[in-house]
Amino acid sequence: MKKIAILANHSGGLYDFRKDLISELKKHANVTVAVPHNDRWEELQKLVDEVIELPVDRRGMNPIHDSKLFRQYRAMLKEVKPDLVLTYTIKPNIYGGLACRMAHIPYAVNITGLGSAIENGGWLKKFVLALYKPALQGARGVFFENAGNRDTLAATGVVPKGRDVVLSGAGVNLEDYPYQPYSQEGPVR
């Protein structure tokens, strides 16, 4: 059976927003996820074949921490030997993507949002785009959750032509999170 690895920066977010996709993938492949140990850990363990705890400093910009994450991704890929890797969120997309590219493992990147580093501009935007470019160039596909993010990144030249896909329906499962009218009174909860 094929092996798929999924890299993300939050176990709860991966479970809450990707469990339907993971369940479908499980019908066709063994699924390993590498995520930090936080929300929904036990549920994620029941859903997949293997969960590897891999800390991700989601908001930090420490190059020592990020280089450690890159090395951990390299080691994990060498151990798991996946046939395909899916990455979610900026650090797994960049460092996981680069690790996959160096290991010649096919991978697809899901850009869930641009984040403040790109949206705020300046030197940090240039730095992040410089990291994104080689990470995305090796990807088999670059998935976006909205056309605006795709257009913004495509305009910078970091997205490989013909490999970008805007997903329709990458949002929440309305059976798990039913529609509720917006409250006009009091704080939003």
Per-region residue spans from a language model:
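Short beta-strand scaffold positions
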Residues: 35, 86-87, 144-145
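Donor nucleotide-sugar binding/catalytic pocket of nucleotide-sugar-dependent glycosyltransferases
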Residues: 52-53, 133, 137-179, 183
